From Swiss-Prot:
Name this protein carries in UniProt: Co-chaperonin GroES
Positions of region (Disordered): 32-56
InterPro entries listed in its UniProt record: Chaperonin_GroES, Chaperonin_GroES_sf, Chaprnonin_Cpn10_CS, GroES-like_sf
Keywords per UniProt: Chaperone, Cytoplasm
Gene Ontology process terms (BP): chaperone cofactor-dependent protein refolding
Family according to the record: Belongs to the GroES chaperonin family.
One of the record's GO cellular component terms: cytoplasm
Chief site of localization: cytoplasm
Organism: Bifidobacterium animalis subsp. lactis (strain AD011)
Subcellular compartments: Cytoplasm
């Protein structure tokens, strides 16, 4: 089944990883103190931006990749009760290889 949203140009739709709820020592982190995660899973990838000659620049990620992205990159969107992040390829920092 394909994802119901199709990103444009060099945009990527990411499902953010869950924020940590507990510290390594076992302390519970309240919701208002949780930091937004900077990683998630790629759900959909746009076709890529066009270069000066009009050719598509291939994307570096694919659906299913786990990625790290910049702290202030992307736009949070809500669609059908779910929260997603739409980021530009330029806001991606790395693919997680585990």
């Amino acid at each position: 089944m394909s994802f119901p949203l199709t990103p444009l140009e060099d945009k990527i739709i990411v499902k953010q990883a869950e924020a940590e709820t507990q510290t390594a020592s076992g302390l519970i982190i309240p919701d208002n103190a949780k930091e937004k995660p900077q990683q998630g899973e790629v759900l959909a990838v746009g076709p890529g931006r066009r270069d000066d000659e009009g050719k598509r620049v291939p994307m570096d990620v694919k659906v299913g990749d786990k990625v790290l992205y910049s702290k202030y990159g992307g736009t949070e969107v809500h669609f059908k009760g779910e929260e997603y992040l739409i980021v530009s390829a330029r806001d991606l920092l790395a693919v997680v290889n585990d």
